């Protein structure tokens, strides 16, 4: 039997209704806009084969959201959800762009570090979500290993939220051809973080692709694979 989680990162189960009220009292409208955007994008893939794969899990918000949408619209066995992340401190070694390094410093000062893999795994078990892989480590090492273990992998939705240039480029170039026709590449950082934005622009130009957005918010942007 799984031991219930009563508190995590200073938040307590006993105050859950206060947190929900506080969200609606104080959060910016953009938080609801993004939730609706994610819902609409997930709805578009329910008749497509392929897994949902996210890069940049952080504290698990969007991954849990996708798992909840899967539970509402499909089942755990409809598709796997995979989350890649360092699961801790934002990796900054080897970043060539000063703007990317500055962004990471500002982001961590404001938002702190992401959840550890074990912490997020416990949350997912608590919520009853199955068929989810959490892959921890440097994406330049973990993604090739994961693909070697699952050469059949195809994606219905690729969610990129890594902020900076080098890993965004690596994942796009490695996984785009595994996205099924009609599948989505969803980019959280386009026109908000310089590194990821420049990489996406280069990729669109090289591949002759079109970037789209939904009407209710400026992010995420997305590509529909022809």
Residue ranges and their predicted role:
Residues 4-29, 46, 51-226:
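S-adenosylmethionine/decaboxylated-SAM
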Residues 37-47:
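Conserved alpha-helix/loop element of class I SAM-dependent methyltransferases that forms part
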